């Protein structure tokens, strides 16, 4: 049986802040399963590793015997979360929100235990709420309090517009906790204002206020900015295993430890500390630690056999040894007249633009089947198949087909 101290150690791993820790201890002491909530607005069709920081923490609560609520903000998604934004977000259509929500449902059970998960939509209660009810909810907070939020304060100070509906978002998110009778709510550090709103509203409606647990925002592949699709520094959980492995192996050595802390189930805190000491002493190469993390992530989102195949393919390319045929085949559609090499590199996702492709070619940083190529105007047509490599770690096994 897990003790309260052991539970708190697992819950606290990677956590930025717990409000209030004494209340969490008291609720754990009752022995009753807690209702642990995290909300996700379906603003894009796929989840990435940044989203899984919260999902991983939810999974840990499940391992301790608690019930988690994966809340899909199909209603709030149409408002648009203003947290951390310097301009009003464009609301999504109902159709976009529902389409994205369906993909979320398919993806979350790669991490969460289906038996201990409630999937809920906040349109369940907001779809029934009248205009009068919404006005009553709005009366629970003041404009002055809203302007204490850093993002709103900055926009107000710089005379950037703040739409009235953006003030509603924290209230609506907070009311979700009332509707779900949440004991704990998880969120990123940028969500703290909204999470605390839930505590206040629960007290107003006669409920015990939820414990707030904030998680750090995961740095993306660049090791600097928050992981984001718009920045291109992300790993999607639906990506091919070879992409998960390749991208993970590209991250900086310092970022590896951060990712282990927030993303790994297999490497305990004690083992991570030991591995760090071995790397510092030169006993262990940091690449081996990174490879272990890459294997774990590829296995989690695919399976062990697929992960090993991806690692073998990655190893074959970076060392020039082994069977590159183990790499998954990526089809690229080309016109009947073919595609110039610079365009091919871009179409295969190996460079962000033709100009960048041309620059890489001039640097002699491009290989096809192990041979350096330099001519950006070289034409490739249907039927070509080969391994194209840009730099040391960016590669793809490509087959050209006509549309």
Swiss-Prot record:
GO MF: ATP binding; RNA binding; tyrosine-tRNA ligase activity
PROSITE patterns given in the database record: AA_TRNA_LIGASE_I, S4
One matching Pfam family: tRNA-synt_1b
Motif ('KMSKS' region): 226-230
Enzyme Commission number(s): 6.1.1.1
Matching InterPro entries: aa-tRNA-synth_I_CS (IPR001412), aa-tRNA-synth_Ic (IPR002305), Rossmann-like_a/b/a_fold (IPR014729), S4_RNA-bd (IPR002942), S4_RNA-bd_sf (IPR036986), Tyr-tRNA-ligase (IPR002307), Tyr-tRNA-ligase_bac-type (IPR024088), Tyr-tRNA-ligase_bac_2 (IPR024108)
Keyword list, A-Z: Aminoacyl-tRNA synthetase, ATP-binding, Cytoplasm, Ligase, Nucleotide-binding, Protein biosynthesis, RNA-binding
Domain S4 RNA-binding: 339-400
GO cellular component terms, semicolon-separated: cytosol
Binding locations of ATP: 229
Similarity-based family: Belongs to the class-I aminoacyl-tRNA synthetase family. TyrS type 2 subfamily.
Subunit structure: Homodimer.
Annotated GO biological process: tyrosyl-tRNA aminoacylation
Enzyme class: ligase
Compartments reported by the entry: Cytoplasm
Motif mapping: 'HIGH' region: 42-51
Protein name (Swiss-Prot/TrEMBL): Tyrosine--tRNA ligase
Main location: cytoplasm
Catalytic activity: tRNA(Tyr) + L-tyrosine + ATP = L-tyrosyl-tRNA(Tyr) + AMP + diphosphate + H(+)
Keyword Flavoprotein: no
Cysteine disulfide partners in this protein: none
Annotated function: Catalyzes the attachment of tyrosine to tRNA(Tyr) in a two-step reaction: tyrosine is first activated by ATP to form Tyr-AMP and then transferred to the acceptor end of tRNA(Tyr).
Gene3D superfamilies: HUPs, RNA-binding S4 domain, Tyrosyl-Transfer RNA Synthetase
């Amino acid at each position: 049986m897990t003790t309260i101290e052991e539970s708190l150690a697992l819950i606290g791993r990677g956590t930025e802040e717990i409000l209030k820790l004494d209340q969490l201890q008291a609720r754990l002491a009752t022995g009753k399963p807690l209702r642990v909530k995290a909300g996700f607005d379906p603003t894009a069709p796929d989840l990435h590793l940044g989203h899984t920081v919260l999902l991983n923490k939810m999974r840990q609560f499940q391992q301790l015997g608690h019930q988690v609520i994966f809340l899909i903000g199909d209603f709030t998604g149409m408002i648009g979360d203003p947290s951390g934004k310097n301009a009003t977000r464009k609301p999504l259509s109902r159709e976009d929100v529902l389409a994205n929500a369906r993909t979320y449902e398919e993806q979350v059970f790669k991490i969460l235990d289906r038996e201990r998960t409630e999937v809920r939509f906040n349109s369940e209660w907001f779809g029934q709420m009248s205009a009068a009810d919404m006005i009553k909810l709005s009366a629970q907070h003041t404009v002055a309090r809203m302007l204490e939020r850093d993002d709103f304060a900055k926009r107000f100070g710089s005379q950037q517009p703040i739409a009235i509906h953006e003030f509603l978002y924290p209230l609506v998110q907070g009311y979700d906790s009332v509707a779900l009778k949440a004991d704990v709510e998880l969120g990123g550090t940028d969500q703290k204002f909204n999470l605390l709103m839930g505590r206040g509203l629960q007290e107003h409606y006669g409920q015990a206020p939820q414990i707030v647990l904030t998680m750090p925002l995961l740095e993306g592949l660049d090791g600097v900015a928050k992981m984001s699709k718009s920045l291109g520094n992300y790993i999607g959980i639906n990506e091919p295993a070879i992409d998960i492995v390749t991208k993970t192996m590209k991250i900086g050595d310092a970022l590896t430890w951060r990712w282990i802390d927030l993303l790994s189930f297999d490497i305990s805190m004690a083992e991570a500390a030991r591995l760090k000491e071995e790397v510092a002493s030169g006993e262990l190469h940091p690449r081996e630690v990174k490879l272990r993390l890459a294997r774990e992530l590829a296995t989690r989102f695919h399976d062990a056999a697929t992960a090993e195949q991806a690692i073998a393919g990655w190893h074959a390319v970076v060392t020039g040894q082994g069977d590159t045929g183990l790499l998954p085949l990526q089809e690229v559609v080309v016109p009947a007249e073919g595609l110039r090499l610079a365009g091919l590199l871009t179409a295969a996702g190996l460079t962000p633009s033709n100009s960048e492709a041309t620059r890489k070619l001039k640097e002699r940083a491009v290989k096809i089947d192990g041979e350096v190529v330099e001519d950006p105007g070289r034409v490739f047509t249907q039927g070509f198949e080969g391994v194209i490599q840009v730099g040391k770690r960016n590669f793809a096994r490509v087959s050209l087909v006509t549309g």
